[in-house]
């Protein structure tokens, strides 16, 4: 499902070297399912975009490092969403942009590029996508839905909001002491 969403929303705000919606999907997938699934999702989205949308290999080089590091940073921080965002920014904005240079210069024959040509665009796109992902995931966390998604997907749940609400829940009604029913 994440692959389908990633492919469908990828044309939004997309110019060569910038695809903020891809970073939104990478971070969300990393938090929901972990680094390996996020890496697989980024690879599948990149290949589909390259095959059917004519996107250059930037679809892969600009996604896989950030997707994986986003999940690694999220797990290493024991569930801090901001660390997942920083993992995406570092992985895509720095590593992905530097790897993109030889791919585009030597394999695709692009001229006039230097090693940092894609860095400003990649960092800008990851910041935009990272902000969107952070807002989205924080909203899910505050409502307890993030933990429910993670549980249903079989991922490790780090969400403290979920644990607090589960501890204070009335076993008969399922509502916490602070709950309001409207």
Where are these regions (language model features)?
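Loop-helix junctions at membrane interfaces
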Residues: 1-182
């Amino acid at each position: 499902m994440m692959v389908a969403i990633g492919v469908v929303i990828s044309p939004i705000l997309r110019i060569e070297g910038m695809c903020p919606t891809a970073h939104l999907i990478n971070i969300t997938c990393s938090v929901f399912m972990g680094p390996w699934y996020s890496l697989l999702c980024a690879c599948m989205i990149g290949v589909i975009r390259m095959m059917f949308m004519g996107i250059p290999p930037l679809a892969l080089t600009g996604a896989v490092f950030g997707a994986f590091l986003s999940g690694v940073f999220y797990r290493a921080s024991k569930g801090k969403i901001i660390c997942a965002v920083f993992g995406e920014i570092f992985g895509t904005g720095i590593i992905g942009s530097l790897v993109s240079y030889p791919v585009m210069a030597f394999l695709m024959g692009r001229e006039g590029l230097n090693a940092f040509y894609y860095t400003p665009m990649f960092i800008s796109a990851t910041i935009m996508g990272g902000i969107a992902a952070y807002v989205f995931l924080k909203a899910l966390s505050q409502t307890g839905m993030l933990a429910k998604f993670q549980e249903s997907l079989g991922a490790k749940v780090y969400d403290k909001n979920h644990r607090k609400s589960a501890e204070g829940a009335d076993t008969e009604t399922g509502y916490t002491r602070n709950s309001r029913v409207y």
